[in-house]
């Protein structure tokens, strides 16, 4: 591919859909802390002055859904009624029921290693060596921008900022290599007291410049900071939020395919989540091993069946060893059955709330980001 542009977007922890994701995963974490084998599918809806938490849960644990919800909203920063959403006074509705026994009989087996997939579906994982964290640059820097927005807001450095924000970054590529940034969009909710001019200057100096490498910026780079001028009404007052509506933000920013399944609120028996994490783990280790510059993995499952129904590996012509060697290395060194990948990645632990904002991938604290299989794969492939 010759010269081209590629764009990815992200949203802040205060975006309505991300509030919903974080509540769903906070509930999941609280349950897993008491009952690691719980079955959880937690969905959240947020709108002005209210949160509704629903879904299906089978567990021996008891958790305070209302308090978990309020604490999550409080941590994000919605603590004043003038924002249209206040952790201390919003209504919290709990409509959680039990998981269907028809699903349980397919998932739970006498031999844990034969645990079936919780549903059918397709999942993708991806890695590229265009950044040190083996993630696409556009989504990486889009996440960093909104994360920086949250940091300067919470620290009080820019005390006129409010929790809701969105970013978008367009990168320029030439022959597959990054040559610069073409455009940056950052829209942030703010108080009524700040002028548009002051806000734009502050965002440029305190959010954009500290995050984006100067060598990728030029006088041709276009900046769009709050392009409509005013963004006072935001969060759930501006738009309702739902769990699972930011699946491209959660993954690779459109640089790789997506199977359609959301992550937040789902325990690891749900392969929508756990197999997508495993696919990232496999792809990242293949790239880290030097077997390819780019790698995309597709996995598919049937409900109640342990083994994947298919494994597909695409390296976009960047492979350094034969395709057959890459496929065989995956078959020999990764257990992609639901039980196997849970054990391989230690997924039955309360680590999910922090995944629910700023991306599930490219963050080294998560076990699926480890490259501990890279050396094994290098040896298998005969790479020196």
Swiss-Prot record:
Cofactor requirements of the protein: Mg(2+); K(+)
Matching Pfam families: S-AdoMet_synt_C, S-AdoMet_synt_M, S-AdoMet_synt_N
PROSITE patterns recorded: ADOMET_SYNTHASE_1 (PS00376), ADOMET_SYNTHASE_2 (PS00377)
Pathway(s) of this molecule: Amino-acid biosynthesis; S-adenosyl-L-methionine biosynthesis; S-adenosyl-L-methionine from L-methionine: step 1/1
Region (Flexible loop): 99-109
Binding annotation for L-methionine: 56, 99, 239, 270
Reaction it catalyzes: L-methionine + ATP + H2O = S-adenosyl-L-methionine + phosphate + diphosphate
UniProt keyword annotation of Magnesium present: yes
Sites where the protein binds ATP: 15, 164-166, 230-231, 239, 245-246, 262, 266
Quaternary structure, from the entry: Homotetramer; dimer of dimers.
Stored NCBIfam families: metK (TIGR01034)
Known role: Catalyzes the formation of S-adenosylmethionine (AdoMet) from methionine and ATP. The overall synthetic reaction is composed of two sequential steps, AdoMet formation and the subsequent tripolyphosphate hydrolysis which occurs prior to release of AdoMet from the enzyme.
Similarity comment text for this entry: Belongs to the AdoMet synthase family.
Protein name: S-adenosylmethionine synthase
Annotated organism of origin: Aliivibrio salmonicida (strain LFI1238) (Vibrio salmonicida (strain LFI1238))
């Amino acid at each position: 591919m010759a010269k081209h542009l590629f764009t990815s977007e992200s949203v802040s922890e205060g975006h309505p859909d991300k509030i919903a994701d974080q509540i769903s995963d906070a509930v999941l974490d609280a349950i897993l802390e008491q009952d690691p084998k719980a079955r959880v599918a937690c969905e959240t809806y947020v709108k002005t002055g209210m949160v509704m938490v629903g879904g299906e849960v089978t567990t021996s644990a008891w958790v305070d859904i209302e308090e978990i919800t309020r604490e999550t909203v409080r941590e994000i920063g919605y603590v004043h009624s003038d924002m249209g959403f206040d952790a201390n006074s919003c209504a919290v509705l709990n409509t959680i029921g039990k998981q269907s026994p028809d699903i349980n009989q397919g998932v739970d087996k006498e031999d844990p290693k034969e645990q079936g997939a919780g549903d059918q579906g397709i999942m993708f994982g991806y890695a590229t060596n265009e950044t040190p964290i083996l993630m696409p640059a556009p989504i990486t820097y889009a996440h960093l921008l909104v994360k920086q927005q949250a940091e300067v807001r919470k620290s009080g450095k820019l005390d006129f900022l409010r929790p809701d924000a969105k970013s978008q970054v367009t990168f320029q590529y030439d022959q597959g290599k990054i040559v610069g940034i073409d455009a940056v969009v950052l829209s942030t909710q703010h108080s009524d007291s700040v002028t548009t001019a002051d806000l734009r200057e502050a965002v440029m100096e305190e959010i954009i410049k500290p995050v984006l490498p100067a060598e990728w910026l030029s006088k041709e780079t276009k900046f769009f900071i709050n392009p409509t001028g005013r963004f006072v009404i935001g969060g759930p007052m501006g738009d309702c939020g739902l769990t699972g509506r930011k699946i491209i933000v959660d993954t690779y920013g459109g640089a790789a395919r997506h199977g359609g399944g959301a992550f937040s609120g789902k325990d690891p028996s749900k392969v929508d989540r756990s197999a997508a994490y495993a696919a990232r783990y496999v792809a990242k280790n293949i790239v880290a091993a030097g077997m390819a510059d780019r790698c995309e993995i597709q996995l598919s499952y049937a409900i109640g069946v342990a083994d994947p129904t298919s494994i597909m590996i695409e390296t976009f012509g960047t492979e350094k060893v034969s395709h057959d060697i890459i496929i065989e290395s995956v078959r020999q060194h990764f257990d992609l059955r639901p039980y196997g990948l849970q054990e391989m990645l230690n997924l039955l632990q309360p680590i999910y709330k922090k995944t629910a904002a700023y991306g599930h991938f490219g963050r080294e604290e998560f076990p699926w980001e480890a490259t501990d299989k890279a050396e094994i794969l290098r040896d298998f492939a005969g790479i020196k």
